Each structure stands twice: as C-alpha cells, then as structure tokens.
UniProtKB/Swiss-Prot annotation:
The active site is at C50. Keywords: NADP, Oxidoreductase, Porphyrin biosynthesis. Catalyzes the NADPH-dependent reduction of glutamyl-tRNA(Glu) to glutamate 1-semialdehyde (GSA). The record marks H95 as: Important for activity. This is Glutamyl-tRNA reductase. It comes from Shewanella baltica (strain OS155 / ATCC BAA-1091). It catalyses: (S)-4-amino-5-oxopentanoate + tRNA(Glu) + NADP(+) = L-glutamyl-tRNA(Glu) + NADPH + H(+). During catalysis, the active site Cys acts as a nucleophile attacking the alpha-carbonyl group of tRNA-bound glutamate with the formation of a thioester intermediate between enzyme and glutamate, and the concomitant release of tRNA(Glu). The thioester intermediate is finally reduced by direct hydride transfer from NADPH, to form the product GSA. The lineage of its organism: Bacteria, Pseudomonadati, Pseudomonadota, Gammaproteobacteria, Alteromonadales.
Length: 416
C-alpha cells in the first residue's frame, strides 16, 4: 500500500503554468476517474485551486501519474517536471494535513483551503474514486485541520488588509452584524471586505463607486445597495462603518463632509478605515470628535504583529500534523499486517485442504490408516516449515543476525 502526492503550487510555478495544469469544475469528475484508472487501487483525489493543483493517489506509480497529468493537459514533460513536487507514504500524509491546515498556503493559516480540500473529496466520492484508505486519509485530515484551528491561534489574527479592516470593526463594535456599512470602491479589496462582512452577519451594506454598473455587479452577490460617488453625502450620515479603497488620486471624503455627517448622526461614533494608496480620506478627519480614522499603515502594523503570532502558532500546528501523520501510518501498517495474516492463513488452509483430500483418497482406496496419518503429518510439517527454513538459511548465510533473531522470535524458538 503506497500513498503518493504529486503537485504544483504558487511556490514552484508561475500563474501561467498553474492555469495550464488546473482542472475546471465541469471536467474534474471525469479527470478523477481517468486518474484513478491509472492506480492499482482505483483511488484518487484531485485538489485544484488558483494556487495549487495536487493529485493524491493510493497504489499509484509516480512516473505514471506525472505522465497522466502531462497527457491530460497536453503539456511537455520539460515544462512541467521542474515545477512538480512529490511525496510518498507518511510524507504524503503530512503534506495533505499541512495543506488542509493552511500551513502551505500563500497566506499562512488561511481557512479557505480546508473548504476547497473538502470539496475535492466530495467530488472524488461522487466520481467513485474513494475507497477505504483515501477515505480514512481525508477524514483524518479534516479532523487534524479542525484540531489545528482549535488548539492553536493560527486563524485568530488577521493577515490581509481586508480581513484586518473587518477585524478592527469587530473589536470596536460589540455587535458588528447590526451596523450599517458604507464601502467606497468596488475593486478586489473592497469585494473581499464585503465577503468578510457578510460572513460576520452584516446585512446593511452600501457600495459607492465611480461607475454604478461595477458596484451593481458586486452588490448582487452580497445583497448590498449600489450608489455613485456623488451620492455619498446622502448616505454617509447613516454609516456606522466606512471602509474605502479606490484608485482616486484625490481624497474622496473630506473633513467637512464627515463633520457634517457626524452632526446629522447626533455625534454617534463613526469608524473610518482608509486602505487606499494614495489616501481616500483626508487625514484631518482624525481630528474630529467621534470620528475614528485608521489608515493602511495602521493595518499593516497590526498585520505584521499578527503574522508573527501566526508563525508561532504554525510551529505548534507542525507538531500536530507530524504526530497525526505518524498515527495514520500506524493504521496503514495495521492494515498491511491484517492483509499479511489473512494471506498466510489462507495459504496454510489451502495446504491443509490439499493434503487432507489426498489422505482421504488413500483411505478410500484401502491404504493403511496409520501410514496415511503419518504421511499426512510429515507432508504438512514439510510444507509449513519450508518457507521459514529457507528464510532462516538465507539469514544465516548472510550473517544477518538481526533478521535471524526476528525469525527465531516469530517462530517461537527462543521460548524453548
């Protein structure tokens, strides 16, 4: 039984190559079936994300799996091979556990990868490419990833600007889900902020953007309201939280506009987070009572502290994955011993059945009973001690005292 993991990721390959070896969702079902057919066990799972493509197989040949990957995508070996990594046995188990725990991610400890690995496993089960070993491997991996999350602080601290902005809001407001949020901009960062806000239960979001169409497209996904930049003065007084990230060369929110909004709010506090470079919010806004302004520099300082915290947590997580990979391999070895015992017992029973049938035939032909029984006992003894005798002889000739000792112990010779 041999587990193999072969992959390519953000550390080993360019975006261009990663795109070429990725598997689209509509084709991954058939791809898993095709890959599984190249293994002796019929077990395979493909994990394919924007940052990695990894193939996990049981009883597969490494060279054959790599050849399959290249054939499937029509790629030359010389272009792919230098960017591939491979793991076997416990190393493969440990790698999968590290991946699912976020220890191998572009952003250390990010939680999204666990969901992606789970989704890949579900698709493999639907494709019929999961049996005992792979099933146990992935189920154990999910338990390990959960243990890493609960036993360490790897996911507790924000390490992206978007996540840090939302985390700051959560610390300032006792219940962020009831706040009203104004997002300025509709780029990738604001979209990620909106996702984090939605994940935290925020239902009231307004997105202001230079082009209304872009804002509307984003709002459909998050159930938000789209407005133009010109409408900001009308919506600003209603906002408890303002997060801005545009590409504007000039500030969008001035001190006067914010001051007017605070008066309309009867001086209820307002959190403003400016994650744009150059800045979207005039720095003088920080001088206003009830306005709490944070810039991207403030967030980066938090992120640096949090990254150090995550690295410390990652060291604890590495210990967990190491221990759990050992335990999984113990289970694998127990399976192998069960298979060996079953095979040995079956072989011995076959020898017995053959010799008993031969003895019964002789008795039916009138042979002397005592002679038949003696012959049966001798033949059975010779058959059963043949393989152990050969092993003892070979170990003795080679001077392999360790193997010789193990054989003597296994055969019970040291008890006499």
């Amino acid at each position: 039984m041999s587990l193999v993991a072969i992959g390519i990721n953000h550390k080993t390959a360019t975006v261009d190559l990663r795109e070429k070896v990725a598997f689209s969702p509509d084709k991954i079902h058939d791809a898993m079936k095709s890959l599984a057919s190249r293994t002796r066990s019929g077990e395979a799972v493909i994990v394919s994300t924007c940052n990695r493509t990894e193939l996990y197989c049981n009883n597969g040949d490494e060279a054959d799996i790599i050849a399959w990957l290249e054939e499937y995508h029509g790629l030359d070996h010389k272009d792919v091979a230098p960017c591939l990594y491979n793991y076997h046995g416990q190393d493969a188990v440990r790698h999968l556990m590290r991946v699912a725990s976020g220890l191998d991610s572009l952003i250390l400890g990010e939680p999204q990868i666990l969901g992606q690995v789970k989704q890949a496993f579900v698709k493999a089960k639907e494709a019929g490419t999961v049996a005992l070993t792979i099933d146990r491997l992935f189920q154990n991996t999910f338990s390990v990833a959960k243990k890493v999350r609960t036993d360490t602080e790897i996911g507790a601290a924000a390490v992206s600007v978007a996540f840090a902005a939302v985390s700051m809001a959560k610390h300032i407001f006792s219940s962020i889900s009831t706040t009203k949020v104004l997002l300025i901009g509709a780029g990738e960062t604001i979209e990620l902020v909106a996702k984090h806000l939605k994940d935290n239960g925020v239902a009231s979001m307004v997105v202001a953007n230079r082009t209304l169409e872009r804002a509307q497209g984003m709002c459909e996904e998050f159930g938000a309201t789209a407005i133009t930049l010109a409408q900001i003065p009308d919506y600003l007084p209603k906002a408890d939280i303002v997060i801005s990230s545009t590409a504007s060369p000039l500030p969008i929110l001035g001190k006067g506009m914010v001051e007017k909004a605070l008066k309309q709010r009867r001086h209820q506090p307002m959190l403003l987070v400016d994650i744009a470079v150059p800045r979207d919010i005039e720095p003088e806004v920080a001088d206003l009572d009830d306005a709490f302004l944070y810039t991207v520099d403030d967030l980066h300082s938090i992120i640096e502290q949090n990254m150090a915290s995550r690295k410390e947590a990652a060291e604890q997580a590495e210990v967990i994955t190491e221990e759990q990979s050992f335990l999984f391999m113990d289970w694998i070895r127990s399976l192998e011993s069960v298979d060996s015992i079953r095979e040995y017992r079956s072989q011995s029973m076959a020898v017995k059945d053959e010799l008993v049938e031969r003895a019964l035939n002789k008795l039916a032909q009138g042979s002397d009973t005592e002679q038949v029984l003696i012959e049966l006992a001798n033949r059975l003894t010779n058959k059963l001690i043949h393989a152990p005798t050969q092993a003892l002889t070979a170990a003795s000739r080679q001077g392999d005292l360790n193997t010789l000792g193990q054989l003597r112990s296994a055969l019970g010779l040291d008890k006499n």
